[in-house]
Every structure is written in C-alpha cells, then in structure tokens.
C-alpha cells in the first residue's frame, strides 16, 4: 500500500479549461435536486480515516500504522509518514515517538485511533462543529489490516451513537485484487449489520454506502468497467443508496479518469469527484467552479444524480491553505452551484496534510527540527481548531443559515478580551474558543450557539470593568462563580469550575 491515502495524478488546468462546454453552467436556482434532504443530501460529510495505531495500544496490527513508513519502528525524521502534526492535548492516551521534543519542551507523542477515547473525541469535535455525517474509510479488509479495520468500525459506531453523528461505510477499491467478490462478501457478512444502528446514514430511506476508486486511470485501480458496474448494481440491488468516489474528470473520461466508464458513473445515486491535489489557491478553486463544477452539476441534473463535490482545506506542508481562504472559496463556489452535499477531504488525514481535525498551531507544538509545518506556516496565527470552525461556518452558509459571501467570516484566532467575554476549552486560554460574548444572559442553548459547549470551558478572558457570573446548571442554577477579571485556570478555583459552565450572566 502506498504511504498516502491514494495516488494522485496531477490535473492540468489548461486542459480542463479547454474542455469547458458552453451552455452547461447552471445557477443554484436552476439546479433541481434529485433527492430530498437526508443524511447526505443537504449535509456536510467528512471523510474519516481512523487508521492510526501505535505500538502498545492493543490494536491487532501491532505497530505504528500510518504514522511511520516502517510500522515496526516509531516515527522519526527518517521514518516519517506525516504531513502534519496533530494537536494531541485533548487525548487521554498518547504514545512516545522517536522525534525530538516539541518546541515547547513537551515530549513528541501521537494518538492512536484504536483508543475509543480518540474516536469519541473526534466525533465530539464533529458534533461541536457542524459535521453531520462521517464516511468511514474501509480498504481491503481481507489482509493483515482486517481485524483492526473491523474494530474501528465498531468504535466509530459507538462514537456516532454517543455524539449523534451519522456514519456510513466508504469502501476504497485501491489495490483490492479480488474486489468484485470480496466487497460483496464483506458487506453481507460484516458491514451490513451496522445499518441497524440508528446513526447509520440513510438517504431516500436507504442505507448509504460509498465506493471510491472506480474508473481512476491508475494501475492499482485497473478494474474493467463491466466489473465496476456489476458491483454498483449489486449494492443497489441490496437496497443501498450508492455514492461513487470518482475521478475529478469523470464526466469527460480524461486525465485522471479512464475512458469508457460513463455508464458506471451514471449508475451511482450520488457522485463525489476527488479533488485532493487538484487546486492550491483561490484561482484554482475559481477555475474549477467555472469549468468543472457547474458542468458536473448540469450532468448530474440531467441523469437524476445527486452531486457531492469535495472540499479540501489544502496541503499544509506545501503551503496551499492560505490561512483558510482556499477552503472558504470552495464553500462559496459550491454553494453558488447548488450542490446537493459536500464532502470534506478529510477529517483526520494527517499523512497528506489535508486534515481539518485539530493540528499544531505553531512551532511550539511541532517536534523541534522536524521541518513539519504548523498552521501558522504563512505567518498568520491560527488556532488548532481553526479548520473545524471554518467547516462549521461553511456548512452554515451551504445550509442557508448565514448569508452567501465570498468573504471568509471565520477568524483564524478568536480575538479575546476587548470585544467581549471569551471562554476557552483549555486552561491558559488555549484550545478552541467561543465567540466573544456581549453583555447579557446566556442559557445553555445560547452558549452553545456561540460555540461554548456544555461543561467545556477551562479559562476565560473578561474585558476590564465587566463581571461574569457563571453557573453549573442551565437557567442560572446550581453552583455559581463571580469573576471581574481574567481567569486562566478554572481548576484552581474554589470550588473547582473546570468543565462546569452551563449558563452565565455578563454585566
């Protein structure tokens, strides 16, 4: 298996531009939906790898799965498979690597997806940041990775049910030689049972399943069109709503797409073209809007297919993110197109550096001398949860909850102190931050609407002359604390106020 999730072919912008077809672009108002809103239509879906393991975590794979090139040895500068370094402060268990200490002097440790608390933390982040549905990636489970991947499916189900997120199985056909028979066998014998979960995604009343990799012009996906069509139709015959993770240029059958696969693509209920490695700036996003996305939507409309294009944050290590401007432009453009859903590529893809999950915000949280870039790589400070917050706002715009705007409304760092009261997830004003709160009374619901989750806050900044009275219960009940100055550490208060805030009054 390759070290990155998938092998990508460079897309030629010039070729794509030459292939644009006059008269195929549709406005959002002219793009009818093939399906009504469900668990993928009208929703923000995130691709979830869940494929990291560490020596000593108890996973059957028994190694540093996807963290290092040689899984038998801990990751180090010479044995590295990471494109970005995660912010690990929210995990209860982490594992020592062979990297030098972080810039802040702390040991360089990584999380394991095999720990249930890790998966729970990720799904809690999804809950807090408007990620409706998670697509669990499932590569060939018939080899040595199978037992660990089976365990991850169970862990994802548990987390999804705990945090109220929908999930579905997303098969990846890469390097799967006996895919035609084994994918059907795996669904029948193992994965279909997960559709009994109340949190398993349904669309049009059918359980959702995705197949990624059909039609790609790559040697490790050389499945004949007839085989691909057989598998798609088999899943549809099982009563599934089938999504196709297809090449970028599926419609024209060029570049990353093999020719002669259009019947395969049109057999899917929803099409989700891949975008990682295709754009690196706002101009690239606009090019695809003008020359690809609108034409894709028109084709999907003509064939009654739902359209779920990818949104990428950008490769952090290559400097593509533009502190969120690249990602926001895609949210803006695709909302204008009138797409039926959006697929975030990816939630936890630290290998390719295209993750939205919490990431090292500065050199203080990256191993010294590693060369791994932090979120502030272009000189703009960003909080570790910035791309989660950006995804939340992009989803709100897509759903019509905030106005359509080309101007990114999400600040890379939430300003604190002068504009209002700001609560923080961690002590010392670290981690995620809520919105700056004006004077007034805030129930649990009001705080949550401002990004302050229940029993979540660990520190607060308070403007001079302001007073905050915090309560441990909703509607200003329970234990109360009154502050008229910044509080950097709720654990030091008497009584302890850490993770206790449920409502508050600000005057």
Regions found by a protein language model. Give the residues of each.
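A broad structural signal for short, well-ordered beta-strand segments within beta-sheet-rich domains
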Residues: 23-26, 39, 268, 456-457, ...
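Glycan-processing catalytic domains of CAZymes
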Residues: 32-415
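Acidic/polar N-terminal loop/beta-strand segments that form early-domain functional surfaces
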Residues: 11, 49-51, 137-139, 426-427, ...
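Compact beta-sheet-dominated domain cores in extracellular/mature segments
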Residues: 416-507
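N-terminal export signals
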Residues: 7-28
């Amino acid at each position: 298996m390759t070290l990155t999730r998938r092998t990508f072919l460079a897309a030629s912008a010039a070729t794509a531009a030459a292939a644009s077809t006059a008269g195929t672009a549709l406005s959002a108002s002219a793009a009818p939906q093939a399906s009504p809103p469900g668990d993928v239509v009208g929703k923000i879906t995130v691709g979830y790898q869940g494929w990291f393991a560490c020596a000593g975590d108890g996973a059957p794979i028994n190694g540093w799965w996807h963290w290092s090139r040689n899984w038998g040895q801990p990751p180090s500068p010479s044995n590295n498979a990471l494109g970005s370094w995660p912010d690990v402060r929210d995990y209860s268990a982490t594992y020592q690597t062979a990297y030098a200490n972080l810039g802040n002097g702390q040991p360089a440790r990584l999380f394991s997806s095999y720990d249930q608390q890790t998966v729970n933390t990720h799904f809690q982040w999804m809950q807090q940041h408007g990620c409706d549905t998670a697509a669990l990636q499932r590569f060939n489970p018939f080899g040595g990775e199978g037992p660990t991947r089976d365990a991850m499916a169970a862990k994802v189900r548990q987390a999804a049910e705990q945090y109220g997120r929908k999930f579905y199985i997303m098969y990846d056909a890469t390097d799967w030689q006996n895919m035609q028979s084994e994918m059907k066998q795996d669904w029948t014998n193992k994965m279909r049972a997960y559709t009994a979960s109340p949190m398993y995604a349904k669309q049009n009343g059918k359980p959702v399943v995705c197949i990624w990799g059909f039609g790609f012009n790559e040697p490790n996906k050389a499945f004949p069109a007839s085989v691909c069509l057989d598998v798609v139709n088999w899943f549809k015959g099982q009563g599934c709503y089938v999504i196709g993770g297809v090449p970028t240029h599926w419609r024209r059958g060029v570049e990353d797409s093999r020719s002669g696969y259009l019947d395969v693509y049109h057999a899917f209920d929803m099409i989700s073209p891949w975008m990682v490695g295709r754009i690196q700036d706002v101009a690239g996003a606009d090019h695809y809007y003008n020359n690809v996305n609108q034409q894709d939507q028109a084709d999907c409309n003509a064939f009654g297919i739902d359209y779920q294009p990818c949104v990428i944050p950008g490769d952090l290590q290559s400097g593509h993110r533009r502190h969120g401007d690249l990602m926001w432009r895609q949210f803006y453009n695709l909302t204008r197109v009138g797409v039926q859903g959006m697929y975030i590529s990816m939630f936890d893809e630290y290998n390719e550096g295209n993750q939205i999950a919490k990431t090292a915000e500065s050199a203080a949280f990256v191993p010294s001398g590693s060369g791994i870039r932090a979120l502030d790589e272009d000189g703009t400070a960003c909080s570790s949860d910035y791309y989660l917050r950006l995804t939340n706002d992009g989803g709100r715009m897509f759903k019509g909850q905030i106005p359509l705007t080309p101007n990114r409304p999400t600040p890379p760092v939430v300003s604190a102190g002068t504009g209002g009261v700001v609560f923080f997830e961690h002590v010392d004003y670290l981690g995620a931050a809520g919105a700056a709160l004006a004077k007034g009374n805030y129930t649990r619901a009001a705080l949550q609407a401002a990004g302050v989750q229940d029993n979540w806050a660990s520190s607060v900044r308070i403007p001079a002359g302001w007073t905050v009275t915090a309560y441990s219960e909703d509607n200003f009940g329970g234990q109360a604390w009154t502050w008229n100055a910044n509080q950097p550490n709720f654990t030091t208060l008497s009584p302890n106020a850490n993770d206790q805030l449920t409502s508050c009054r600000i005057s």
